Amino acid sequence: MNRNEFVKYYWKHYKFLEKQFLDTERYVAIEKDNYAVYSNEFLNLFVLICNEYDAITAEYCNSIKESARPLNMVDKNELLCENINGFKDLSISTKFKYDNIKILPFSKYKKDKTYDWWQAYNLVKHKRSNIDSDTKKPNYYKANLKNVLTALSALYIFLNKFYIEKCSSGTVNPDFVLNSDVFNDFQQ
């Protein structure tokens, strides 16, 4: 995939999702104090962002190892952890105006298990009205600022990794940087 294809198929959509996320700040400030705030808009964004993350990780994993069947996230995580140096430690921070929050979306990776935010996504997607035994609230409440921000950070990090490794032959062109309005520039 070349740069133009990457921009067309993935980056434009990321920027669209990021803009939708930033539009929520009219109602909810992007800061840790609001992490538990949930809404229909966060639910919509959470599902869209996680679907996009699923798509880009599928393409990345297929470039490493062709599979006759679609890989689930546990399978993808194993491939990602094996093929991306320091995968669990990849992090990004929000820009200063958003409290400079450091996010490590993959840090809780364990073999045969997905990340907390991905588990929350699946519960929101498939068991939205079920009551969580810990919180005593429906899983709908997991469509909150924290999970949306973490999922968006994972997508941003992964798009950067994908672009650097699969679209630019491992070299970063200083004339083309994947700028985010939410996150600081990705550092390898």
Kindly label every feature range from the protein language model.
Residues 29, 57, 61, 65, ...:
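Hydrophobic/aromatic-lined pockets within catalytic cores
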Residues 39-64, 149-156:
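Short, hydrophobic, well-ordered secondary-structure elements
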Residues 54-119, 126-131:
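Short non-catalytic regulatory patches outside canonical folded cores
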Residues 16, 20-27, 48, 52-55, ...:
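Amphipathic, well-ordered alpha-helical segments in soluble domains
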